[in-house]
Amino acid sequence: MAQSFLGQKRLRKYYGKIREVLDMPNLIEVQKSSYDLFLNSGEAEVPTDGEGIAGVFQSVFPIKDFNETSVLEYVKYELEKPKYDVEECQQRDMTYSAPLKVTLRLIVFDVDEDTGAKSVKDIKEQDVFMGDMPLMTPNGTFVVNGTERVIVSQMHRSPGVFFDHDKGKTHSSGKLLFACRIIPYRGSWLDFEFDAKDIVFARIDRRRKLPVTTLLYSLGLDQEAIMDAYYDTITYKLEKNKGWVAPFFPDRVRGTRPTYDLVDAASGEVLFERGKKVTPRAVKKLIDEGKVTELLLPYEHIAGKFVAKDIINEETGAIYVEAGDELTLEYDKDGTLIGGTAKELVDAGITEIPVLDIDNVNVGPYMRNTMAQDKNMNRDTALMDIYRVMRPGEPPTVEAASALFDTLFFDAERYDLSAVGRVKMNMRLALDAEDTQRTLRREDIVACIKALVDLRDGRGDIDDIDHLGNRRVRSVGELMENQYRVGLLRMERAIKERMSSVEIDTVMPQDLINAKPAAAAVREFFGSSQLSQFMDQTNPLSEVTHKRRLSALGPGGLTRERAGFEVRDVHPTHYGRMCPIETPEGPNIGLINSLATFARVNKYGFIETPYRKVENRMVTDEVQYMSATEEMRHTVAQANAQLDEDGRFKNDLVSTRQSGDYTLAPSENVDLIDVSPKQLVSVAASLIPFLENDDANRALMGSNMQRQAVPLLQAEAPLVGTGIEEVVARDSGAAIMAKRAGIIDQVDAQRIVIRATSDLELGDAGVDIYRMRKFQRSNQNTCINQRPLVKVGDTVLKGQVIADGPSTDMGELALGKNVVVAFMPWNGYNYEDSILISERIARDDVFTSIHIEEFEVAARDTKLGPEEITRDIPNVGEEALRNLDEAGIVYIGADVEPGDILVGKITPKGESPMTPEEKLLRAIFGEKASDVRDTSLRVKPGDFGTVVEVRVFNRHGVEKDERALQIEREEVERLARDRDDEMAILDRNIYARLKSTILGKVAVKGPKGVSANAEITEDLLQMLPRVQWWQLALKDEGDAQVVEALNEQYEIQKRTLDARFEDKVEKVRRGDDLPPGVMKMVKVFVAVKRKLQPGDKMAGRHGNKGVISKVVPMEDMPFLADGTPVDFCLNPLGVPSRMNVGQILETHMGWAARGLGLNVDEALQEYRRSGDLTPVRDALSHAYGENVYDEGIAGMDEETLIEAAGNVTRGVPIATPVFDGAKEGDVNDALVRAGFSESGQSILFDGRTGEQFARPVTVGVKYLLKLHHLVDDKIHARSTGPYSLVTQQPLGGKAQFGGQRFGEMEVWALEAYGAAYTLQEMLTVKSDDVAGRTKVYESIVKGEDNFEAGVPESFNVLVKEVRGLGLNMELLDAEEDE
């Protein structure tokens, strides 16, 4: 693998053997490309039809008024610059969006009243503002109201035509009833189905069924056309006194026993005798000879056949029989032929009768029987029938029925198959319509019914609806497009009405349009759609996975309850497209999936996966992306098929996939091969080393739990990785990458300034400033913090990681820590997956994480007067105000705990009647305390921490307090510093370029002290101030022009810099847009350090999870022979039954990696003593093996080598890619290299007694994660608190500060103990006896211990409910009763 800059600083030993010819595509490409297509569809010179915003406008416009005297046309659209950038939107709780301006043209016509001819009277064009269009951030998310959201892609059934059967469930006989459904992208569904009697029916929009011939009549076919479309015609000719002559099809008699002699019409020879079986050999002989073409059939054989065409008396025009009628022969008792339609035809001199080729074996009479049952005979009655079904209760007229039928399937505004639907239909029915033909055609419907009838006759196969060729992905762009179309259609109605009601000559397009519905549709989609989700921002992996998620739920999709097993199951076509492992446990299993690593979505919305081409057993490097449908035609080998040096298959038989089946195929038949073994799984699953040794259920848990890992204080990359960590860190946007190559100019914790050396354009300052995100709060309250990785003077390349983000370490994803674990029980503290940890872990902050809580308070304008944020709060002592500044807002850096005031706020309260005591107090102490109450923002119970940031927002025109002004000053200083730095680098750059241009040239004139025609030298330039260099006029015309251009560019750049600075400062100083009624808002961010403690949940990467049971002092933990205590004790019983053996291999491999790292450490110490590099080179060569050493390390200079060695002293990192990683032999080999025993087990000693344990223990280094289920967030206690209004019982749950439920079973327990008084308290005074609660409070205050329980409030609720049922239930007092 190619080494990146950081990859050289910390080399990973790569165990993969399969060469990858294709880099993994950008992981958030799905989101970005889809939305780009939606927004920028109008950039093409010729606008593409039907794509993106432009497509939506083209489909809705032009809008005509009702009289068609004016028309509103769409011309073009443009997105302006967004008002605020992403960061400002997040701080101000705004949506990151850009104003959308649409150019519309209003054309007014003059209509000549006599001729009705139109002439253009007036044309007006105008730009109209159509609301704000949300923009996507560079990381593929949207900022909506200040929070980051992700739009999840949706899987839905592809538009097109599908054939299916009911699996024999509908009818008791178990007969298969076939059905066909045409699903459009939008519009009415059309179903065709068989019933148990083999009659074909049609349904529109799942309504009442109609005979399918009714639909065909409505399309303008008559009986003859229908019969012609579905059946072949054969002609029966009458031979005098012999019978009928008909064509002979030898194939059809194979294997049958004829009921009459089969006689050759030409020779009269009996081919097959009656009742004797026809052998295949005899049939083959007949076909080969090809002589017999016609058979002679008995006269009565024509009975039961159906006429193919209307047979008419040429002279009178009378119809003998109609197409589809049955031919009959009637006999009297003694067998004499007396009548029937066939006899009538013969009697009338008709000797050739065209009949339908129905033999009831290969071709059934279904369509003919349907036609016979259908009471309609022509188009008009058929249309009326359809009208009655679609609009029951309305009197049908032919015109209305015809109009309705046309709008159902043939009107592009109401019905849209979409390009996908048309392509799918063409493929399934072998049609050749253009994919711009988006409505149905007559041929399509006829072909669908034909295919359905063929299925019933046993030809063709039904479709598999879970096949990925029949399911497609709707990504952000498309979902947004549909939503915007809905908004525009709402708007269209209003526009039409306005065009008809106003004086059209005087208005402009602006006056006709109210953009509210369109903007509202967009806002509603981003705010409340099921697919617009709060981004999972726990760590970089969870962000990436969230953006790559595919959901089958959501509008137009499935619901959890209705989704069966088949939809959720893994399908062969998922291979390389959707991950078979990563899906949630629980009700959503299989409905929410993840895109595989190499997969991409094509323009039709189908998921494609890459394959390498194979030609004549030779694997080429040509890569081809294929959708599931295309792949069905190929034979695909697996990536691990053995190849020789030339890239040919070694074996004659190769394991392959052919149309969904796994088979061994000859290698010459193979035409494709997988690109990589990891193309099967998703990003999260491909981060699990030794995945191939884990059970699938545990792998599922492993990939899901990695997403819940909390970023730790100090990230540490895994020793045993898979080599994909770097890709995730890069694509997630957590780490910062250099946009272009350059040299580091300045670095501090806040920002990196790079002087660019490549991609320089003329008008470019050549400065890139990267700001770090420092201690920002993520959606999940984890901490986002970025740290620079580079030093001043470093050279960086484009795309290189220059700063680490949360959970990244030197540009690699680092979700947890490498710790020493022992698989052994320890005094029962590992029972049921509990985990025992060493005190070192807690002491050294190994698993400590920072969490940031946001507190917000708003001062509103109330009816009684404005609320006020102040330090002057009634009845609060100075001690409680110690952390507040003069404005009443907490200082940054203050340590706060539950109940502390963060922001002081007072609210005016109304006059309430006063008790005498209060009157006395007011008389003594004056007015102030009475008219306001304390509504300060206080810290919630259970939250401790340090204030890290405060933001103050003021309404326009409200005077700013001291704190707001201070924050503003700091912000402006920061912006000025940025501007000055950029200016300094710009100056340096420009003057360097100027100097190189003018040095050594001759100046015609210059500033004071420069003689005419002097040569410009270094000394001369030193003497002049830099600003005066511009005044040196050069003799050479060309050089003078260059200097002129440079000067102009310099001025432009300075102006741009100043303008940008002014704009930013203006935004900082401007008031904020706050919700109505809010005068001022303060946000306080409190950071908490959470150490690892009992009750926290931890997990490995293999689905091995557990809860910490105890923290043991370091000296009591089991220790190794060299005195190293282990960090974690895990239960060995957690492995066998769960079958996730990958964790054991990881432990061994980690142990070997650590051992090799220690060897390097010793060599480094030797180097520091002696200054000799040889031991370091030897140790690295030993650790990495000769090949890696020769390729990557041998050529390093001393400084780089020592840095590289220093980075691996804690363990040599290795990469073992999924399905292509280290085998058991490699693990043994690594253990031996590191100087350990092959078993991977060590002798351990008990820390408490110092004695050796009875047998060797598996000890190793394992990567463990701390999950986002922290005991601090879950533990909760309450004495008194809020009560429910109706039942007066305490609320439930930590969020409501609720109580613990004493439920039915707990009551039984107290009953069983006979604890009557405890039980009474539980059910009354501790719960919902309002009077009792008060009495208890009083007695506690007075120091007494007697109280009595009253009636629980819930009993009163019950009484009221019974009264609501009309029963007057009363509670009688016992004394009164007597």
Curated annotation (Swiss-Prot):
SS bonds (residue pairs): none
The keyword Chaperone appears for this protein: no
Example of a GO cellular component annotation carried by this entry: DNA-directed RNA polymerase complex
Molecular function per GO: DNA binding; DNA-directed RNA polymerase activity; ribonucleoside binding
Pfam family, one: RNA_pol_Rpb2_7
PROSITE patterns: RNA_POL_BETA (PS01166)
Reaction it catalyzes: RNA(n) + a ribonucleoside 5'-triphosphate = RNA(n+1) + diphosphate
InterPro entries linked: DNA-dir_RNA_pol_bsu_ext_1_sf (IPR042107), DNA-dir_RNA_pol_bsu_external_1 (IPR019462), DNA-dir_RNA_pol_su2 (IPR015712), DNA-dir_RNAP_su2_dom (IPR007120), DNA-dir_RNAP_su2_hyb_sf (IPR037033), RNA_pol_bsu_bac (IPR010243), RNA_pol_bsu_CS (IPR007121), RNA_pol_bsu_protrusion (IPR007644)
Database matches in Gene3D superfamilies: 2.40.50.100, 2.40.50.150, 3.90.1100.10, DNA-directed RNA polymerase, beta subunit, external 1 domain, DNA-directed RNA polymerase, subunit 2, domain 6, RNA polymerase alpha subunit dimerisation domain, RNA polymerase Rpb2, domain 2
Keywords noted in UniProt: DNA-directed RNA polymerase, Nucleotidyltransferase, Transcription, Transferase
Enzyme class, first EC level, given as a word: transferase
GO biological process, one term: DNA-templated transcription
Coiled coil regions, renumbered to chain: none
Subunit note: The RNAP catalytic core consists of 2 alpha, 1 beta, 1 beta' and 1 omega subunit. When a sigma factor is associated with the core the holoenzyme is formed, which can initiate transcription.
HAMAP family: RNApol_bact_RpoB (MF_01321)
Family: Belongs to the RNA polymerase beta chain family.
Protein task: DNA-dependent RNA polymerase catalyzes the transcription of DNA into RNA using the four ribonucleoside triphosphates as substrates.
Protein name: DNA-directed RNA polymerase subunit beta
Organism: Roseobacter denitrificans (strain ATCC 33942 / OCh 114)
Lineage, top ranks: Bacteria, Pseudomonadati, Pseudomonadota, Alphaproteobacteria, Rhodobacterales
